[in-house]
């Protein structure tokens, strides 16, 4: 039911392309996953999302538990039936959101007690509870409940977070009983190399269908994130998908793929779209800018997204954004998601063609790799 096949390797880097098989279809890697936190990629219908080339979509356990509740989602046949998406799905455990968004009352080895920001009620979230919620949501992949330490954090605090993460992973494994759902573990360790290595080995020992690297893009310097990926990835099983959580910029994805990462997720493309910004050729264009007001050319003539292929011009998008029309935000979000998906697809093709190290590793904003995607 679940499996990961590697079809090509880069001769000069650790980059590889492959296919992660799930009950709802294949995920060709390397691959960016759009984020649909509340069972929707903001402002985009599932039909529109399918036209971007998206294969796997991410939703969030924390937010869906608070609204509408996993019971309602389960009654609709799980997330797939609830949102009308028939492709693969992944649910984050909500651990990051509990620690970053929740009003924490207590954290101990048992779990986390926090106050619901919506109605003030107290919620007791344990690894078992997080796993039960994800089984009810029914995504193809569930993430283990972990403790993501902030940046910066003391070494002792990160040691405690790693210890809890590994103990909680064992409890998630024990609680997980859904055969048609894969459970992934998460590597933590902050910016301490020895703790990252210890966590990578500890999580790998559970022999789960896939492994994620978490605790990055939380405020650390980007060079530190690159070092974490370089240190951790060689310690992970080669025959399983590797997922770098919360990353969605072109350079960071290219660096990660060069080090053997397969999957990514990030809210960046839709967040930028909602603020009137388009991703074009490695740049960020503010479509509110007056220079687009009389520009009647497509946003990106080479882009097959519904926005560009649909004949929507820069001038029209400028008008929509300036007028605060919701359609403008949708069109830019569709384009931005397609842009990141095209980029990961181009990396996959470059690996197969034997030119990844020339085109993408290391990738820089003025790289000649631009013409390949």
Swiss-Prot record:
Pathway in which the depicted protein is active: tRNA modification; tRNA-queuosine biosynthesis
Cofactor binding note from Swiss-Prot or TrEMBL: Binds 1 zinc ion per subunit.
Cofactor entry: Zn(2+)
EC number: 2.4.2.29
A molecular-function term among this protein's GO annotations: tRNA-guanosine(34) queuine transglycosylase activity
Main EC class the enzyme belongs to: transferase
Amino acids binding substrate: 92-96, 146, 188, 215
Claim: Metal-binding is one of the keywords in the record: yes
GO BP terms, alphabetized: queuosine biosynthetic process; tRNA wobble guanine modification; tRNA-guanine transglycosylation
Record key words, sorted: Glycosyltransferase, Metal-binding, Queuosine biosynthesis, Transferase, tRNA processing, Zinc
Reactions listed under catalytic activity: 7-aminomethyl-7-carbaguanine + guanosine(34) in tRNA = 7-aminomethyl-7-carbaguanosine(34) in tRNA + guanine
General function of this protein: Catalyzes the base-exchange of a guanine (G) residue with the queuine precursor 7-aminomethyl-7-deazaguanine (PreQ1) at position 34 (anticodon wobble position) in tRNAs with GU(N) anticodons (tRNA-Asp, -Asn, -His and -Tyr). Catalysis occurs through a double-displacement mechanism. The nucleophile active site attacks the C1' of nucleotide 34 to detach the guanine base from the RNA, forming a covalent enzyme-RNA intermediate. The proton acceptor active site deprotonates the incoming PreQ1, allowing a nucleophilic attack on the C1' of the ribose to form the product.
Record-stated family: Belongs to the queuine tRNA-ribosyltransferase family.
PANTHER family: QUEUINE TRNA-RIBOSYLTRANSFERASE
Protein name per its UniProtKB record: Queuine tRNA-ribosyltransferase
Source organism per UniProt: Parasynechococcus marenigrum (strain WH8102)
